[in-house]
Amino acid sequence: GEPPRSFHWQWRDKDDVFHRDGALTPREFFDKYVAYPLDDLVCLIHCPMDGRAFNRLYTIGHLGNVAEGDIVRYLNVDLATFKQAAADMIVKRSEPVWFGCDVGQRFNRDLGVLDLDVYDYALTYGVTHTAGKGERLSYAHSMMTHAMVFTGVDIDAEGAPTKWRVENS
């Protein structure tokens, strides 16, 4: 639907004290409570598809979430750069990092496990998956299906990220 022209915002703080503010326009809310320098950030993707060069800007059709909003541009980077940028945001800026991923194929909800080897397709079906990420993206066998946030990272002695703490919705 159409976004509200103004709204009242109410919340309880960490001490369970009730607060209310408004009427606020969306812009007033952003300026008062968010005031984040969004123009200082860039959206990164790791898309190793044929014909999608690294260090170039791309858009993704049907991925915008604001009618008549700005086109979102993504900088396609290699995986090492992607991981290092996310780690730097967490370690150097104390900022969580939003990310989108494909959880539909390798997720076992009952176990709460997201792992590339959660299912043994070779044992069950007698086949193995040999397509790489780029091929899976090219054939729409893989796509962003879920969003989560990196909230922590372990760094090895060389400064490289080794494992991530993920906050799921």
Residue locations for each model-derived region?
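Long non-globular sequence segments
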Residues: 1-169
